[in-house]
């Protein structure tokens, strides 16, 4: 298996059993294809996750990431792939936090929520870099407060 940076459009087209022309009809390059792929994960998460509980949102996110462990690890070894994955995480985390606060996706996170989102983002990236050995539920229990009241208090203190 190759790291994403070394995968060519020819490799992707061959694996998908389509012609390169067909690939280029839909995508301008492999990074646009990766962006689309990550957006599909986001839609999958949104459909799968009707919860307003932030910890359940995070558990679902970690489960999806771990389910696609090999792909995620290969994506993170390269600047552009890492950047796209990081953007995906930012969007997902912001949406989860807003939803758990009963806000719209278009609303802006307050400072406490931004601080929390950046911290969670860093923890997830570190977990990915270390090979995702901890089960998602164990990672959450080690990392986050045992109640969402603590998180709500953090949001309101800023």
Task: Name the predicted role of every residue range.
Residues 5-17, 24-51, 59-62, 66:
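An amphipathic alpha-helix adjacent to DNA-recognition modules
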Residues 36, 83, 111, 134-138:
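Short, solvent-exposed positions on alpha-helices
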Residues 36-38, 60-93:
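Amphipathic alpha-helical segments used for helix-helix packing
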Residues 52, 56, 70-73, 96-97:
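Arg/Lys-rich, alpha-helical DNA-contact motif
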Residues 56, 79-124, 145-148, 152:
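Amphipathic alpha-helical packing segments from all-alpha helical-bundle domains
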């Amino acid at each position: 298996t190759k790291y994403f940076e070394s995968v060519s459009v020819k490799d992707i087209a061959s694996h998908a059993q389509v012609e390169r022309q067909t690939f280029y009809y839909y995508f301008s390059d492999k990074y646009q294809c990766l962006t689309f792929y990550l957006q599909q994960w986001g839609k999958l998460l949104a459909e799968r996750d009707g919860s307003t509980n932030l910890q359940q949102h995070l558990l679902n996110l970690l489960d999806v990431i771990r389910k696609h462990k090999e792909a995620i690890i290969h994506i993170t070894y390269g600047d552009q792939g890492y950047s796209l994955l990081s953007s995906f995480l930012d969007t997902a985390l912001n949406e989860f936090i807003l939803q758990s606060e009963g806000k719209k996706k278009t609303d802006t996170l307050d400072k406490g929520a931004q601080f929390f989102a950046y911290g969670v983002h860093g923890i997830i990236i570190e977990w990915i870099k270390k090979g995702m050995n901890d089960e998602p539920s164990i990672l959450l229990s080690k990392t986050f407060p045992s109640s969402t009241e603590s998180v709500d208090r953090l949001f309101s203190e800023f």
